[in-house]
A protein has these predicted regions:
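Acidic, low-complexity terminal tails and accessory targeting/binding regions
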Residues: 81-95, 146-161, 176-231
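Phosphate-coordination/substrate-recognition cap region in phosphate-metabolizing enzymes
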Residues: 37-111
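Short glycine/proline- and acidic residue-enriched helix-loop micro-motifs
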Residues: 101-127
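Beta-strand elements within well-structured catalytic alpha/beta cores of enzymes
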Residues: 2-6, 49, 157-166, 170
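Short active-site segment of divalent metal-dependent hydrolases/proteases
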Residues: 11, 170-171
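An N-terminal RHG(E/S)-centered segment typical of histidine phosphatases
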Residues: 1-46, 53-55, 61, 65, ...
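Hydrophobic, aromatic-enriched interface-forming segments
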Residues: 117-163, 171
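Glycine-rich, phosphate-binding/catalytic loops in enzymes
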Residues: 21-23, 64-67, 91, 180-183
Length: 231
């Protein structure tokens, strides 16, 4: 089984120097999404899951137009992280936004872990994983052991491939889950995906189950112009 993780296209975070809540895509974001979708043929994806936030929903549009997926599902639990401090940023200027994140990103690991954002991330991740496991179980994909690595039972009639269009924070939880890696409040910065880049996980059979390995990370080779490759 293969899982394709895609981050949304470039969002229009700032309009008239005001930070936007639930922004749509920039013109470049639409270009990135179109080029990303062109890499997949009609009905090459069994199921596509997508976040309902505008930037993800608009990234989905060319995938829908090209009929990439046989089935599309929108899930609330795929939304991006948004703690109370981040919510308070909406409507503020670019200078205020930069100042906020510079301060947050300069914390020690110890400070970050016990901060309001660090505690929020624990609940954020738990919600994603609980819902993810529920949906995977419906497809015949169940984690049966994690003593050494996450070992999955994958039914023969389960999907051959799954695509998930979401966000950097959401993707950090998904990657940490499938690859059985520690998840921290800053994990999304360790594995920061480019806009509309392709990250692929492929299951590998062992004697008594399967585990997922990272086959491809952050592939944006389909965006030829380096200036169009953004984070």
């Amino acid at each position: 089984m293969e899982i394709v993780l895609i981050r949304h296209g470039q969002p229009e975070w700032m309009i008239n120097d005001e930070y936007q809540k639930n922004p749509g895509l920039t013109e470049l974001g639409y270009i990135q999404s179109t080029k990303s979708a062109r890499q997949f043929t009609k009905h090459s994806i069994d199921q596509l899951w997508v976040s309902p936030l505008n930037r993800a929903a608009q990234t989905l549009t060319p995938f829908e137009t090209n009929e990439v997926a046989k089935e599309i599902k929108t899930f609330e639990w795929l939304k991006e992280m948004e703690d109370k401090d981040e919510v308070a940023l909406y409507g503020k200027s670019s200078d205020e936004i930069m100042s906020f994140f510079e301060k947050r990103n300069s914390q020690t690991f110890e400070e970050w872990a016990v901060s309001s954002h660090g505690l929020y991330m624990q609940d954020f991740a738990k919600n994603i994983i609980t819902n993810l496991e529920g949906e995977l179980e419906k497809l015949g994909i169940v984690c049966i052991d994690d003593t050494f690595d996450k070992k999955f039972e994958i039914r023969n009639d389960s999907l051959e491939n799954l695509m998930i269009i979401s966000h950097a924070g959401t993707m950090s939880v998904l990657l940490s889950y499938f690859l059985n890696m520690p998840l921290y409040a800053w994990t999304w910065k360790k594995f920061l995906p480019r806009h509309t880049g392709h990250t692929r996980l492929r299951s590998m059979a062992i004697s008594d189950g399967h585990f997922f390995r990272l086959k491809e990370f952050n592939n944006v080779s389909f965006i030829e112009n380096p200036e169009e490759q953004t984070y």
